[in-house]
Regions:
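Short basic helix-loop element that most often maps to the first helix and adjoining turn
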Residues: 3-22, 74-77
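Residues in the recognition helix of alpha-helical DNA-binding motifs
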Residues: 8, 22-23, 33, 62
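Recognition helix of helix-turn-helix/homeodomain-like DNA-binding domains
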Residues: 25-38
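DNA major-groove recognition helix of helix-turn-helix/homeodomain DNA-binding modules
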Residues: 43-58
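Short, charged recognition helix plus adjacent turn
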Residues: 60-79
Length: 79
């Protein structure tokens, strides 16, 4: 999932470590979030939204490739 975390963090002059301390997570977690290797849990997404005073959907953006195409149907489940 794409996100604006790096931009928001840098606008505040914070390092990844400083943001991690604010959130109660590791610096590695912040790095993984910023690079899109990790999607946040819902509680973490809410903490980020409160911290940056923005709606979650203005911080996180679904990957276009991950979105099902309009009119597409889910694949049938194997039985």
């Amino acid at each position: 999932m794409d996100n604006d975390l790096r931009v928001l963090r840098e606008q505040r002059g914070w390092t990844q470590g400083a943001l991690a301390d604010e959130l109660g997570v590791s610096r590695q977690t912040v790095n993984a979030l910023e690079t899109g290797r990790y999607d946040p849990s819902l509680p973490l997404a809410f903490r980020l939204a409160r911290l940056f005073d923005r709606p979650i959907e203005s911080i996180f953006h679904p990957d276009e490739e991950a979105r099902p195409h309009e009119g597409a149907h889910p694949a049938p489940r194997a039985r």
